[in-house]
């Protein structure tokens, strides 16, 4: 609560603090203002500096970061869970003691009424109510209340005013009159920000003192070549230990000796006070049975002032460290994301490069395979063509040789390459080996297949023959008119005997050869042999 008031009212005075940055002399001479000297790094950053930085950032461009709603909701959920956890723990620890106290007071009242028959229960309740009212008014009902001790003497009133402006509010004493309550309201409104200024100044001075001390420690460790992180950790530990010794341990020992508390109760009071919680169950100088010195309560308030400044410096330092840590964490996360994106890009590029290389290699292999296959097809076509030419008569071979010397070679080779599947013939060596043990019927069938192949080839050749070759072909055609008559006779013979497959094949072969310009000279030589074969078959 107190630190919220401090931040709010410090923001009101933060604007005038930024005014000395301007230098009138340099401004009038037309020169840019000299840069302000960079302050030495300090361990603690006061609330005033933080507020000034926020004001300057807002005035320069409105770049002040705003917490997102998701973050606010997440923090709210964490706080609620923290509160529920604390409530469960406190209930488990304190509720049994409260129940035992209720049973104890009920038994005490019953025993008192039984021992004192003249006192009615109503009179006892009235007495207890008066005791509670006196305690709430700051008067202890224990002992003789007619002594000279008072909760509103100068020392006690000064201590109460200190608890108001420090927002501790122990609650052991409070104003009971209407005038006192009204004055307390106004006094708190103007006193809390005033004390905030004082607290900020003391925090700056404490931060400067401890910063110089820590700088000396850092110099000592730098000579020993210790890393910067270790130096800061050691400096922080030393700062916290020194503050705990000065503002927690020593006051706890003093309170234990003066107030008669245990060590736990003394430390409990110190921490509750310096954190401005102030439950009021333990208050320094609140025991009516102890005769305190006049300077005791003002000294306690001065300790509260310096201790609050120390705790404010520590909390501010922790907040700054959390901001720096959050910023570094964001930067590290950004770097991790950048590295991840770079790694992903590299992996993608390598994958693409590998895929490209594989595709190129596969394409090259396919090209090589296609080239080898094409070469094999060409070689097979040439072998088959040579085999077909070997089966022709010498006159036809001479004609094809004359055609090969011209432009027919490329056209015939292209025709063979375009139709490799139609040239499924065996090589000459295999044909010779197979022909040695084959029957006459197989020989006739082979000649028939050769004639069909020759017919197909000559159909393609006709389409690609140039004009000069066509003239040679026509001349050769006129020269073989006598042979055409023999073809007609052979066709008549084929028509008369349709049941003979071999003769039909021979007729088709002769017809195809004559039709394509091939004149088999050995036809007459084979006629007697074919006739004898047909007679034997019939």
Swiss-Prot record:
Chain positions covered by the region annotation Disordered: 412-443, 510-538
GO terms for cellular component: monoatomic ion channel complex; plasma membrane
GO molecular function ontology, one term from the record: potassium ion leak channel activity
Phenotype when changing residue 315 to W: Reduces norfluoxetine inhibition
InterPro entries, per the entry: 2pore_dom_K_chnl (IPR003280), 2pore_dom_K_chnl_TREK (IPR003976), K_chnl_dom (IPR013099)
Region span, Selectivity filter 1: 167-172
Annotated positions binding K(+) 2: 168-169, 277-278
Result, substituting residue 310 to F: Reduces channel gating by mechanical membrane stretch
Residues bearing glycans: 144, 147-148
Classification via Pfam families: Ion_trans_2
Regions of compositional bias (Polar residues) in chain numbering: 412-421
Sequence segments annotated as region (Selectivity filter 2): 276-281
Compartmental location: Cell membrane
Catalytic reaction equation(s): K(+)(in) = K(+)(out); Rb(+)(in) = Rb(+)(out); Cs(+)(in) = Cs(+)(out)
Keyword Lipoprotein attached: no
Compositional bias per record (Basic and acidic residues), positions renumbered to this chain: 522-538
Residues engaged in binding K(+) 3: 169-170, 278-279
Job of this protein: K(+) channel that conducts voltage-dependent outward rectifying currents upon membrane depolarization. Voltage sensing is coupled to K(+) electrochemical gradient in an 'ion flux gating' mode where outward but not inward ion flow opens the gate. Converts to voltage-independent 'leak' conductance mode upon stimulation by various stimuli including mechanical membrane stretch, acidic pH, heat and lipids. Homo- and heterodimerizes to form functional channels with distinct regulatory and gating properties.
Domain observations: Each subunit contributes two pore-forming domains 1 and 2 which assemble to form a single pore with M2 and M4 transmembrane helices lining the central cavity and M1 and M3 facing the lipid bilayer. The transmembrane helices are bridged by the selectivity filters 1 and 2 carrying a signature sequence TxTTxGYGD that coordinate the permeant ions. Up to four ions can simultaneously occupy the selectivity filter and at least two elementary charges must translocate across the filter to convert it into the open conformation.
PANTHER family recorded: POTASSIUM CHANNEL SUBFAMILY K MEMBER 10 (PTHR11003:SF32), POTASSIUM CHANNEL, SUBFAMILY K (PTHR11003)
Protein name, per record: Potassium channel subfamily K member 10
Species this protein is from: Homo sapiens (Human)
